[in-house]
Each structure stands twice: as C-alpha cells, then as structure tokens.
Amino acid sequence: MASLKKSRRVRLILFSGVALVSATALIGYAMRDGIQFFRTPTEVATDPPAANEVLRIGGMVEHGSLVRDGANFSFRVTDGETSFPISYVGIVPDLFREGEGTIATGSVIGGVFRATEILAKHDEVYMPSELAEMEALRD
C-alpha cells in the first residue's frame, strides 16, 4: 500500500515537472520576438517585419531629416549604418529633436515606418523644465 502511494506521488511530481517545463518553453517561444525592446534600422532593413506587424525601432534622429507640417512629422532614424524613414502624426515629446535618441512604435507600410507613438531617450541627468525653473528660483 505504501509503495503504491509512493509511485503515484513520483508520477505526479514527474508529470508536474514535465508540464512546467513545457509551459515555460511555450511561453518563451511565443515571446521570442517581443523580448527585444526595439530593433535598429539595420535590423529592420535586413529582416523586414511581416505586414502590419507592430514593432519598435530605435536610433538617433538623423540631422537634416526632420520635417514638420502641423502635427505631421517625417524624419529618418539612423544607427550609424542604416537610416529608416518614419512618419508620425501627433504631438512629439519635448526632448525630441535631431541628433537625439528616439524609439518609435508602429508598423512598416510601403517602406515607411508609420509610428503611432514616439519616445525621446534622455540621459540620467535630465530634469523637466518645470523642475529646472523651480531649482533656479530657489538658488
């Protein structure tokens, strides 16, 4: 009787272990493309995404490429090797400018990255203008 309970317990533990390993492998496989925070322009150019695949592209806003027409923005993002055209409609962050880092979320349509969101990258010493003004008044 005791050996029967022990063998059932061992089988249950083995089955649970196999199920846990399988679930972890399936989750890892499903997330393989989403683990990377953003792709560089070179990666997007050499390995084009599927039609309407939402992804992030990151790099520096190329000097001389930023064109603004009301709320419409078009610019090129570069990683120093390849540049990729981006278009965006909306309000851009205060720190968004040529020569600065940016990450855009969207999809590639007709060879142009159509962004739905723009993030500006900044260093660790960034201080919002409101706080900088308060700091200046305090001094």
Swiss-Prot record:
Protein name: Cytochrome c-type biogenesis protein CcmE 2
InterPro entries xrefs: CcmE (IPR004329), CcmE-like_sf (IPR036127), NA-bd_OB-fold (IPR012340)
Alphabetical UniProt keywords: Cell inner membrane, Cell membrane, Cytochrome c-type biogenesis, Heme, Iron, Membrane, Metal-binding, Plasmid, Signal-anchor, Transmembrane, Transmembrane helix
Binding residues for heme: 122, 126
Localization terms from the record: Cell inner membrane
One Gene Ontology CC term in the entry: plasma membrane
Family: Belongs to the CcmE/CycJ family.
Periplasmic topological intervals: 31-139
Organism for this UniProt entry: Ruegeria pomeroyi (strain ATCC 700808 / DSM 15171 / DSS-3) (Silicibacter pomeroyi)
Origin superkingdom: Bacteria
Segments passing through the bilayer: 10-30
One protein family per Pfam: CcmE
Cited PANTHER family: CYTOCHROME C-TYPE BIOGENESIS PROTEIN CCME HOMOLOG, MITOCHONDRIAL (PTHR34128:SF2)
Function: Heme chaperone required for the biogenesis of c-type cytochromes. Transiently binds heme delivered by CcmC and transfers the heme to apo-cytochromes in a process facilitated by CcmF and CcmH.
GO annotation terms (biological process): cytochrome complex assembly
One Gene Ontology MF term: heme binding
Record topology, Cytoplasmic segments: 1-9
